[in-house]
Amino acid sequence: MDTFQSLLAKKLSDALASAGLPAAGELTQATDPRFGDYQTNVALVLGKQRGENPRALAEKIVAQLNVSDVSEPPAVAGAGFINFTLWQATVEKQTLDILRDERLGVAETESLRRIVIDFGSPNVAKPMHVGHIRSTVLGDALARVAKFLGHEVIRDNHVGDWGTQFGMVIWGWKNLLDRQALLRNPLAEIVRIYKETNERVSTDPETREACRQELVKLQAGDKENIDIWNECVAFSTQDFERVYGLLDIRYDLQCGESFYNDRLPGVVDRLLKAGIAEISEGAVVVFFHDDPELADKPLIIRKRDGGFNYATTDLATIDYRVNELKADAIWYVVGAPQTLHFKQIFAVARREGYSADLRHIIFGSVLGEDRKLMKTRSGENVPLRELVEEACRHARKIIDEKNPGLSEDEKNDIAEKIGIGAVKYADLSAYRTTDYIFSWDKMLSLHGNTAPYLQNAYVRIRSIFRKADVVAPLSRGESRRHSAVATNIPKLVLNEPAELDLAKRVCQFAEIVPQVLNGFRPNILANYLFELANGFHAFYEACPVLKSEEPSRSSRLALCDLTARVLQRGLDLLGIKVPEKM
């Protein structure tokens, strides 16, 4: 199904060809309704390129434009913008087509790929904390959108389950472990012994050496140490799964660092044989003499003592994902501090001839209301599970005040959807590379750009259908029963400005979703949903639904139905659930 944007873009392309002009500029949704629904800067771009008057070029292009079946005659504005205003009939027909479409007008992408998305990646023997929230919810949202667009997505949780910290964990397990505490709260006890051992290591050379020996034994396959390591991994995985269950996050693979241990020698041998790496001062190193950015930043892939590092593991990971998982693209949703590391890794992979599209998707930090990195009062990282549970408690208080008559089960279910949705949306509505301030009051507000505001718009539509005593708008997973007034009407009537505006916004969902992957920006979708909710509330105030006469009543019910479906689908792509009541 063509979108308004694609229809106009095709006609613009034809007009440029007829005028003997090359393609240039872009056609975008207008940001101000005074300038129509869509606009293009093509004349300004061409004018600058060709040294011609952009307004005269715009008039020349408009003379070749044939858009009479889609929009009013295009208008030239300002220095040379070309503006398009859609016919009411165009909007009515497109809205009706989308109403009957399972995918809400969103076409699958033509260039389908197999994409491995590496996100989350917590460390074993440590609790997940607030620092993991951005990678986790951002990676999940990108995976949901990519899958909806037709890509084959493999979600990989590359957990940190190997490394020097296990020497300390194993020594602490053997010397400091409280078995009763382990039974009560396994991960908390593992964290305690790790912290205590780490403190001893910093001041006691004997403990430091003992921990090193435990690590050597683990790496050599000592049975006792492997058994302890396995228990630590199992306890940590259980804790991860509890958090992921709360957040509705799932993975297809959990290939941690240890999965690649047997592959690391092969990575080094391969790079040495290819002449990509060389031995330097006892270590195996890759130099980037031909890369100005990396020329003074060599990459060690095997240390002098024969040990491997993160670089070796990440190169083995790329090889596995490309050659065994057959990935066309690998997306790493990892914080900005790892930028240099991934530039080096990707440069080595390109030298090896890997053709997969490798992307490092960076993100900013979560700040407290003091604008510093979010911490507990004692200066520790805020545990993620505690943060999520606290969100649900805050939401529950609001529900108790607003709707005390609900049952306990209803209150708990709604609180979970609102609380977790608020946390996710606060993250995803911010541009990913910027820091954002974590504020309970702001993110749980029923006003402004928040998840509860969007959820409330959906709930309000559900209440309209309950009052109308007709089949309500669809929820994901329900049967495909639509009400007669919602889908079987022969025509929509959108005479009022508010309902016409809402219909235009609904139709633009199909234009917005593919844009999310251009720059990996879920905030584009979040901001669209916020504007859609604004449009619905304006429509709700201006256009009576149940009290209006036919054919407006059926038409407005259908528009409500479609708005609810878009809100629900859009929030689902962000990993956010909608309640039926609030």
Regions found by a protein language model. Name each.
Residues 1-92, 100, 104-471, 483-582:
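Non-catalytic interaction-recognition regions
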